Amino acid sequence: QRCIRDRYKWGGFDTPRQFAERLKADAANGGAPAAAGDMGTPEKQAAGDAAVSRFAAGVDCSGFVSRCWRLSRRFSTRELPALSISLPSWDELKTGDILIAPGRHVLLFIRWEGAEKDRFLGSEAGPLPVWKCAERVFSRPMLENSGYRPMRYRGMRD
């Protein structure tokens, strides 16, 4: 697993530069430094955007995908499917596609690990145990059994 600097923050959409600046002095926090991230909880998931802390800096899973896709704002895991097309098969995944469980979690596909296409390298923001942006190898069967769907951003160009 390779960790990237930015911390997870429920509802977060900070760029790496914004994250670093907010840790020094945060206008939303009266000039005091922002906290380096927070955690997602079932309560926050139920409350949605109303649970976003203005005192923490970072990015959440959908904010991470929204930044990678160069979108103008953070689109939630409930909104991202409207910007995407469903792929007929996991075998059609390409770099930059997503695996999504709407309302729960989303991650970016990078590449297959092996010819069997049962494991792949992906990138995500959160969850346990790291609570930050990270690349790691995922199990296709595990995600399929958990309800994840392969999708491609409508604005993606080959």
Please annotate each region the language model reported.
Residues 1, 5-62:
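N-terminal capping segments
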Residues 79-90, 109-158:
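Aromatic- and glycine-rich peptidoglycan recognition patches
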Residues 94-98:
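Structural motif
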Residues 5-8, 75-82:
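Surface-exposed patches in mature extracellular/periplasmic domains of secreted proteins
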Residues 57-73:
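Mid-length scaffold segments of soluble, non-membrane domains
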Residues 58-62, 93, 151:
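Short alpha-helical patches at coil-to-helix transitions and adjacent helical residues
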Residues 104-105:
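Histidine-centered active-site/metal-ligand motif
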